[in-house]
Amino acid sequence: MGTWAVGPFGNDFAQDWAQDLQESKDLYFIEDTLNNVLQAETTEYLEAPFGAEALAAVETWSRLQGKGGAKDEDSAGVDEWVADVQAKLSKPRADIADKAHRVLTLVLSEASELRELWEDSEHYEDWRATVTDLQRRLSA
């Protein structure tokens, strides 16, 4: 995985996901990503690409709720998409919020390859802090 930052959009998988998001005009793509990741709750292992996409999806959901993290060049495409779609959303969906929380728990768990890869790097604590900040923002 090409990674250049600990943020949710600082890797190739997340950037590819964000590119695909541009084709969507509603919450379907975000929810589909979360549903795919949650299948790992039963398969016992979450592979890194799905973990990276999950973080991108949850951060995008967070931005739609007005609880987004820092904007930067890595998030620019997502930020444009959020600005276009946000006004069209009728109300927050508790089911997606619940899925987002479950996904973050899974990404941080022992069953996450993404967590394992970050654990083997010198930036693990920074990455973990980024994910726990996202959890905090979702809960606010």
Q: What would you call each of these model-derived segments?
A:
Residues L46-F50, R93:
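Helix-start/N-cap signature of alpha-helical segments
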Residues F29, T33, P49-A56, K99:
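Residue-level detector of well-ordered alpha-helical segments, enriched
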Residues S24-L46:
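Short amphipathic alpha-helical segments and their helix-coil junctions
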Residues D20, S24, L64-K67, V107:
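Residue-level signature of the C-terminal ends
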Residues A52-G66:
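Short, hydrophobic/amphipathic alpha-helical patches that form generic packing surfaces
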Residues M1-L21:
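Short, extreme N-terminal segment that most often corresponds to the first beta-strand
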Residues R63-G77:
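Short, solvent-exposed secondary-structure capping/transition elements
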Residues P92-A140:
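Low-complexity intrinsically disordered segments
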